Every structure is written in structure tokens, then in C-alpha cells.
From Swiss-Prot:
Transmembrane segments: none annotated. PANTHER family: 60S/50S RIBOSOMAL PROTEIN L6/L9, LARGE RIBOSOMAL SUBUNIT PROTEIN UL6M. This is Large ribosomal subunit protein uL6. Keywords: Ribonucleoprotein, Ribosomal protein, RNA-binding, rRNA-binding.
């Protein structure tokens, strides 16, 4: 039995979960998320918590068991607390500014780089070199953060670029000269 998959998912008050066929829908104070559960896995509600079960011990069922439990647990956390990622910009002249609900970056290119906020994502600019990506869908928050980081990845020689808060950038030494 999967150590992660067998753990029940606690359902906090204020969260409404409906299981219709293979679709699990989670409604909470921050919004609504839904997920289609793959065939052999079943999600059942028992005494104020959700239990994810699998019918057999086949390799596919075992691999999907823990995954499904974690995805549903992330949905419950998302609609109650939400998710956020803080990113920092390092480099002379590199900055970010809010343009309505979107962001505009100056990253050393000859033009500003606009980033539109997808549905369910909210940006918060704390300083010109620090901003936060907020949302209820953990996967979407991570995807948007990774796309923004990819606009100018941290340089291994000088460390300039967009990085996650607390990310350690491995630095290279560079040429030694004569």
C-alpha cells in the first residue's frame, strides 16, 4: 500500500467536495477546482475526510494511488489557503512593474517584456525587484513562475536574472587571464 496514498485527506470546514463519477470538485472560500480521477482509482468520502483507494496492486494502480491523493490534497489546500511563489530579480537595470493585472519586465533586452496573468493567477509587486505569483492551483502557480524565470534565467557567472526567493545559484569562476 502506498504510504502517501493510504493517508486520509482531512476536509476543513467551509470546503465542499463533490464526487461525480470520475470528477472530484472542491469548492472553498478562495474558489473552485476540479480534477478527473484516472480509471482504477476511486475517491470516497468518509466521516469528514476523503479516502483514495485502488482496486488492485498492479503497477499502474500503485503509481496512480499516491499521485491522485496528492493532487486532491493540493486542491483542498489551494481553495482554503492558496499557493504563492516569490521571485526576485537580480541585475543592474532589471526590474518589474505592474500594468493592471499584468506585469512588465525590463530584463536587459532592447524592449520591455510583458507577461499576461492567466485565469486564476494574481501578481503582487512588492518592490521593483521582487514580486509574488498567487493562485489556488499549485500546478498553474508553478508553471507561470517557471515561465517568468525562463525569461532571463540566472547567469552562472554574475548571478543576474530572475530567480525564486531563496534559490541558490551555482556560480562559475570564469576565465583567469594571464
Amino acid at each position: 500500500m502506498s504510504r502517501i496514498g493510504r493517508l486520509p485527506i482531512p476536509v476543513p470546514s467551509g470546503v465542499d467536495i463533490t464526487v461525480e463519477g470520475a470528477t472530484v470538485t472542491v469548492k472553498g472560500p478562495k474558489g473552485t477546482l476540479s480534477h478527473v480521477v484516472v480509471e482504477p482509482i476511486a475517491v470516497n468520502r468518509e466521516e469528514g475526510q476523503l479516502v483514495v483507494t485502488r482496486p488492485d496492486d498492479e503497477r499502474r494502480s500503485r503509481s496512480l494511488h499516491g499521485l491522485t491523493r496528492t493532487l486532491v490534497s493540493n486542491m483542498v489546500t489551494g481553495v482554503t489557503a492558496g499557493y504563492s511563489k516569490t521571485l526576485e530579480i537580480v541585475g543592474v537595470g532589471y526590474r518589474v512593474q505592474a500594468k493592471g493585472s499584468d506585469l512588465e519586465f525590463a530584463l536587459g533586452y532592447s524592449h520591455p517584456v510583458p507577461v499576461k496573468a492567466p485565469e486564476g493567477i494574481r501578481f503582487e509587486v512588492q518592490t521593483p525587484t521582487r514580486f509574488v505569483v498567487h493562485g489556488i492551483d499549485k500546478q498553474l502557480v508553478g508553471e507561470v513562475s517557471a515561465k517568468i524565470r525562463g525569461l532571463r534565467k540566472p547567469d552562472p557567472y554574475k548571478g543576474k536574472g530572475v530567480r525564486y526567493q531563496g534559490e541558490v545559484v551555482r556560480r562559475k569562476v570564469g576565465k583567469t587571464g594571464k
